[in-house]
Amino acid sequence: MSIFTQEVSAINGQSGNIKQMLTLEMLPELKSLLSDSVEQQICIDGILTLWIDKTQLIPALRLLKTLPQPFDLLLDLFGVDERLRLDKDKLPAQDFTLVYQLCSINRNQDIRLKVALANDQAEIPSITAFWPSANWYEREAWDMFGIIFSDHPNLYRLLLPPTFKGHPLRKEFPCRATETEAFSLDDERLAIEQEALKFDPKRWGMEQSNKDNDYLFLNLGPNHPSVHGVFRIALQLDGEHIINSVPDIGYHHRGAEKIAERQTWHGFIPYTDRIDYLGGVMNNFPYILAIEQLANIQVSERVKCIRVMLAECFRILSHMLFFGTFAQDVGQLSPIFYLFIDREKLFGIIEAITGARMHPSWFRIGGLAQDLPKGWDTMMQEFVDEFPKKLDEYEVMVMQNSILKRRSIGIGQYNTQEALDWNITGAGLRATGLEWDLRKARPYSGYENYDFEVPTGHKGDAYDRCQLRVEEMRQSVKIIQQCINNMPEGEVKADHPLTTPPSQRSKHDIETLIQHFLNVSWGPVMPKGESCFAVEATKGVNAYTIISDGSNTSYRTRIRTPSFAHLQMIPKMAKGLMVADLIVILASIDFVMADVDR
């Protein structure tokens, strides 16, 4: 076994939000299996990273999933085009890399396996037999990089149209639309595109009929109000009962990961706001923390506290919308209007603090855009005093409604192991009874200093998933109250050469003005390395993996969103139920298509 340190700054850097660093010596079974052929890469995020041969991938993953304390969650799977990387001499020879990041809930540790692939041999076995959630991740890797997964059940386009040519995350694919042929949609092409989007049951292994009846195939979406976005589900029906279903995503795909390759590190912050467009600064959080971890930037306690307070405000905002739309989809129309009134009050506070409502882009590398305004605490305290009483009323109105209970209890039910197999995180996982919240398990930004509970369910059904988010709003209010009571003094921007200095300092000396000009116009040049940071976002685990080649832009930015993983489980949850039950299941997942498609 050889060990190489790709990130020199890792020795002095932070170790991410993983409590205990995993070593290969702690996994003797894996070490014995891989023998001397494995290469270990020391990464600044503290995740055990091993380069293995593709022939060892299946045995290694099988072993990791069946250990006494298994790595039972396939947190992420993605590709990297390494062909233009400047420091390839420190890496195994490859054109492409496939990255498998696994998480062990019992150990509270991650492991990252990397497989090197040549351009002319970009083929690797599928792992859908171990994790059904790998299906979409492998399809995405083929869609974006052209990597073939042998034995995959349906290796078709996922985020891009069936007629799309090329693989966008390859380095030879243009970053800008102006570098490609102008798009036009004449009648001939329109007919081709429409024909390509027709659902073919045979492609998905669906029978047209059984011995008694012909099946009905129904498109739910992509513009149905109950699918919460531009999203289609092709349903195979026997009367009103769902025999099978195929989610069809990608209509909202904007190429966020490709955009990150041409935007400066600072310039990409506003794009993160639009991933989960209901999450606000919650989207900035993992991206900023991953960069600060990479560059070893330390922020003040005041910055940490303000970030937590704003993140919890957006958690409440997101959950309020979920709560209202869940009731609306079940047929109860009043709650959403009451909740929108309270959302507007909180949006008013957000706007007073950040200058914007839904997409403030307020977090900065090394701090915040500005300090809190005068009177922020009074506004926030008024909301904290008033909202819990109203939430109690809304809970009685919605959760005690007999029709809602009959339509949601026992619907879309799954257990903890099924949730882990399908890469379910957030309230969807905690509804099964597993207390797994990164704010507690792997505290970041000072969350270890706050007193709050992690609500859990026990049935794992639609009703539990809704009830949990109600309880989470109460806990968020509790955290915000502690921020108000204990807001530290201090600067809101770190004194670091890679951060934008305060504007008042740039007016007093030319050196600071030069630094400000360079960081704003060209963007900061981050050190070489790889950094992954995950946070407990509004809908589940949101993680950013960034790869820096020592430039002012990212070489590769991977955005791991919870909604993408959660929609995969729809066919399993809906099978055997009725179309009306599917509407309840969709409402209980809590997703937005921008978070799915990126």
Curated annotation (Swiss-Prot):
InterPro entries xref list: NADH_DH_suC, NADH_DH_suCD, NADH_Q_OxRdtase_suD, NADH_quin_OxRdtase_su_C/D-like, NADH_UbQ_OxRdtase_30kDa_su, NADH_UbQ_OxRdtase_49kDa_CS, NDH1_su_D/H, NiFe-Hase_large
Q: How does it sit in the membrane?
A: Peripheral membrane protein
Gene Ontology cellular component terms for the protein in this record: NADH dehydrogenase complex; plasma membrane
Coiled-coil stretches:
none
DNA-binding listed as a keyword = no
Q: Provide the GO MF annotations for this entry.
A: NAD binding; NADH dehydrogenase (ubiquinone) activity; NADH:ubiquinone reductase (non-electrogenic) activity; quinone binding
**NCBIfam families assigned:** NuoC_fam, NuoD, PRK06075.1, PRK11742.1
**Assembly notes:** NDH-1 is composed of 13 different subunits. Subunits NuoB, CD, E, F, and G constitute the peripheral sector of the complex.
State the protein's name: NADH-quinone oxidoreductase subunit C/D
Per the UniProt record, the source organism is: Shewanella woodyi (strain ATCC 51908 / MS32)
Gene name linked to the record: nuoC
